[in-house]
């Protein structure tokens, strides 16, 4: 199963026609996942680890008998960010459509695998529809999983066999992580069989600590037995161009860099931002697509407005938690396709999102 030997003909045909070779994360990850072991895959963004996590489960869904409708949700994907959840939902469309087409070419009944998303953005009518028609693959966040486990929605989680936790390093060791750990144990208590846990991590070490968080433990009287986790370490060297730029002569005295003739009460004498804006616009113009990260929603709005003012047209848009669901998805799609020059974002875009144009 190290390459494609363990996959069905349709899945192998689609993969071989789409990719030259499997990545290291896939070559090493598939055997562990196929064995049923809880698995932590450590690999950088863009290394194919998400497909490494999903493809085995998708292949099983595609070639097993379709269960009764109330028992269809067998794959649960948990994302720490809504934007990452939307990105994964988009990225699954290609493999699912490709495997259907490959099956048709091979004269096999094409699989009809459905996906669904449950986040804080999901309208109530969609949540109710999901209870009536559960998806095969459910994409959610830690908080939404908790809400599902405490409501009637937990009934659709009983058939879950695979749980994929993306960017697990970002929540392990945090309050959100503790909350998720409890939710995973509650999930294990209500499922028909204990789900296989698959964690994806990009940057953090020691991996043993992340693996321990992923596996959790099984109560044994007054003791606690950790679940064993297989660690797949597939790092990839990546060239980074890192530069620290100070746009003023002295950050403690921004007035020294104020333009000639600026009055004493001119705002440009009291802040470094007037010197920062032109530099950021230069960087924007020098690249196809750029993401500027800031610490607050207000700063995201102000910086986007100032860059657009300097450019004389809309060249960037702001992305943060207060932007509506529709606009966030629109911005992410435009950026992903390379049709938006830049985005000023808070942490809503910081994890694992594959923006090839950036």
Where are each of the predicted segments found?
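Helicase motor core with emphasis on the C-terminal RecA-like subdomain
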Residues: 1-13, 21, 27-28, 34-40, ...
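ATP-binding Walker
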Residues: 47-48
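Walker A (P-loop) phosphate-binding loop of ABC-type ATPase nucleotide-binding domains
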Residues: 44
